[in-house]
Design a protein with these regions (language model features):
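C-terminal boundary of histidine-terminating zinc-finger modules
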Residues: 182-196
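Phosphate-binding loop that captures ATP/GTP phosphates
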Residues: 1-46, 57
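Histidine-centered active-site loop/cap adjacent to the catalytic His
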Residues: 193-215
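Short, hinge-like loop/turn segments at secondary-structure boundaries
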Residues: 9-16, 117-120, 146-152, 187-190
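Loop/turn-to-beta-strand initiation segments
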Residues: 32-35, 70-75, 98
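Signal for well-folded cores of large energy- and translation-related assemblies
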Residues: 5-12, 61-68, 91, 95, ...
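Conserved catalytic-core segment of NTP-binding enzymes
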Residues: 73-74, 80-180
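Phosphate-binding/switch loop-helix module in NTP-utilizing enzymes
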Residues: 40-90
Length: 219
C-alpha cells in the first residue's frame, strides 16, 4: 500500500532502474535487507490515489513483472480488504503459495475475512489459505502489562479459523508501541523482549511452519 514508505522509514526514497539482460527493471528499495516496492514511491505522499479497478490491477501487476526482485526467501504482498479486481488480478498473474487472512475480532471485520477465505477457496481460484491472524486482539496498557482488555471481542478470528478449518497463526495485541513504530518507520519486531515483538516472532514461526507443511503436501 501507499503507506509502506512511511512504515519502513523510506519517505523520499525512489526506486532506481537497473539493466537486467538488456531489459530495464525497477530495483526495489532496500530496508534493512528487505526489498520494498509500493505505489507510495511513485505518488505524492499527501495526494489520494484514485484509481479504478483495472488501473490498480495493472499497477500491482507491474510491481511483479517490471521489477528485479532477485533471489528471495519470501515475497509478501499486502492487499486491501475485500474481494475485488486487485485480488483476482494477483491470483491470475502470480503463482501464489498461499494467502494469510488478517482480521480484527469483531463480527463486522470477520464478515470480510470470511468472504475472503471463501473467495480464495473457490474452485476457479483454489489458492491455499495458510492461516488467519487476529490483529488488535487485546489492549494492554503500559502501566498494567499483565492485563488484557478485549475491546473488540475475544477470539473472533481464532473461532473463525477453527470454524472454517484453516490454521490459526496467532494474535497481535493493540499496543501504543506498534502505532509509534509504524509512524517512525521502525518495525515493532525490533523491540527486543517486548510482548509485541514476542507475538510477532511467534506468528512468523507459526507462519513458516504452516507454509512448509502446505508446500510438502503439494510435492
Amino acid at each position: 500500500g501507499p503507506s509502506m514508505p512511511t512504515m519502513f522509514d523510506l519517505v523520499g526514497e525512489r526506486p532506481q532502474m537497473v539493466d537486467v539482460d538488456g531489459q530495464g527493471l525497477i530495483q526495489p528499495v532496500d530496508a534493512k535487507g528487505i526489498g520494498v516496492l509500493s505505489i507510495g514511491f511513485f505518488t505524492d505522499q499527501d495526494n489520494a490515489v484514485v484509481w479504478r479497478g483495472p488501473m490498480a490491477s495493472k499497477a500491482l501487476t507491474q510491481l511483479f513483472t517490471d521489477a528485479h526482485w532477485g533471489e528471495l526467501d519470501f515475497l509478501l504482498v499486502d492487499l486491501p480488504p475485500g474481494t475485488g479486481d486487485i485480488h483476482l488480478s494477483l491470483v491470475q498473474t502470480v503463482p501464489l503459495d498461499g494467502v494469510v487472512i488478517v482480521s480484527t475480532p469483531q463480527e463486522v471485520a470477520l464478515a470480510d475475512a470470511r468472504r475472503g477465505i471463501n473467495m480464495f477457496q473457490m474452485d476457479t481460484l483454489k489458492v491455499p489459505v495458510i492461516g488467519v491472524v487476529e490483529n488488535m486482539a487485546w489492549f494492554t496498557p503500559a502501566e498494567l502489562p499483565e492485563n488484557k482488555y478485549y475491546i473488540f471481542g475475544r477470539d473472533g478470528a481464532k473461532n473463525l479459523a477453527n470454524g472454517m478449518n484453516v490454521p490459526f497463526l496467532g494474535s497481535i495485541p493493540l499496543v501504543q508501541s506498534v502505532c509509534e513504530a509504524g509512524d517512525a518507520g521502525r518495525p515493532a519486531v525490533y523491540q527486543e523482549n517486548t510482548p509485541t515483538a514476542l507475538a510477532f516472532d511467534e506468528l512468523v514461526h507459526t507462519f513458516v511452519d504452516e507454509l512448509t507443511k502446505l508446500k510438502a503436501k503439494t510435492l
